[in-house]
């Protein structure tokens, strides 16, 4: 469900027509010869036991422009880790797994705690922060995309559309945020509809003009778990383990990137994920 509305300070890239995914991927494949692109997948092992993760892996088999896929795996014992590794081995591109419940990662967390660096908040924020560090250790990675692993109707076009604005040299964006329609016969997107948007707009009415609140209000789906950014931006951001990753990341991007280098991208006409 697309439109032509450019409604504020954030550039909105709508899905105005069905461009074949093969065309997008061909351009990304050419770009990837000069700019290495990495996909970060934060996942719980339980998501491998749902229809969503096998579908995501099946779709990613057709992606040829990624330098690497990095799985950030949480809540997995040894047997679960081996099963997840078996699933991921089906991909054609190199795969790295950061196993947060594994002995080496646990040893690292204990070492950090001993040195007064609190790691007491396991969750998506901590998982992404640690995994980003391992990706950024490769100094020649140009851009990183991240999306959730509970997308039931995942298509590889979503990844291509998410990465394209930050990867393409003619567009010059540093950060892209995914959005999508949540129009069904049920009230999905409740946290955004009933909490996030009313809260932000109430604060704007109470406080008057505030550029940061205007920035947050300009995203069509601020709580979406899909974004891509260039590695130079990723190196400077702080990721909070205690607050929502999605909103805290927008706060960091607001402070560190020029507004005209931030965009939001229409990823899909419909979007369905695992509901809580």
Where are these regions (language model features)?
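N-proximal low-complexity "stem/linker" segments adjacent to membrane-targeting elements
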Residues: 1-62
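Short, acidic, metal-binding catalytic loop of nucleotide-sugar glycosyltransferases
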Residues: 55-67, 86-87, 167
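Active-site-proximal specificity loops/subdomain of glycosyltransferases
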Residues: 78-139
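Short beta-strand-to-loop acidic/aromatic patch adjacent to the donor-nucleotide binding site
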Residues: 138-152
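Conserved donor-nucleotide/metal-binding helix-loop-beta segment in metal-dependent transferases, i.e.
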Residues: 151-181
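A recurrent flexible, glycine/aromatic-enriched loop bordering the glycosyltransferase active site
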Residues: 182-193, 204-226
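A short, conserved alpha-helix in the catalytic core of glycosyltransferases
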Residues: 233, 242-259
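Active-site donor/metal-binding and catalytic loop motifs
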Residues: 263-276
């Amino acid at each position: 469900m697309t439109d032509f509305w450019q409604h504020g300070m954030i550039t909105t890239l709508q899905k105005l027509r069905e461009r074949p995914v093969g065309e997008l991927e061909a351009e990304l494949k050419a770009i990837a010869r000069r700019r290495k692109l990495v996909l970060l997948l934060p996942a719980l092992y339980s998501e491998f036991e749902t229809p969503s993760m096998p579908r995501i892996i099946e779709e990613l088999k057709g992606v040829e422009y990624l330098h690497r896929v990095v799985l950030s795996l949480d809540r997995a014992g040894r047997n679960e880790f081996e099963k997840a590794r078996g699933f991921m081995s089906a991909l054609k591109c190199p795969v790295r797994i950061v196993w947060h419940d594994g002995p080496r990662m646990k040893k690292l967390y204990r070492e950090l705690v001993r040195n007064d660096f609190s790691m007491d908040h396991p969750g998506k924020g901590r998982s992404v922060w640690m995994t980003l560090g391992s990706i950024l250790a490769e100094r020649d990675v140009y851009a990183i995309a991240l999306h959730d692993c509970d997308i039931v109707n995942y298509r590889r076009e979503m990844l291509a559309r998410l990465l394209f604005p930050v990867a393409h040299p003619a567009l010059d964006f540093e950060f892209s945020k995914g959005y999508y329609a949540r129009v069904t016969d049920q009230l999905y997107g409740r946290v955004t509809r009933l909490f996030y948007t009313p809260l932000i707009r109430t604060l704007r009415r109470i406080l008057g003009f505030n550029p940061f609140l205007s920035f947050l209000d300009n995203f069509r789906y601020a709580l979406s778990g899909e974004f891509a950014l260039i590695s130079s931006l990723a190196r400077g951001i702080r990721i909070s383990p205690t607050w929502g990753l999605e909103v805290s990341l927008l706060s960091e991007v607001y402070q560190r990137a020029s507004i005209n280098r931030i965009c939001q991208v229409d990823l899909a006409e419909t979007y369905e994920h695992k509901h809580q």
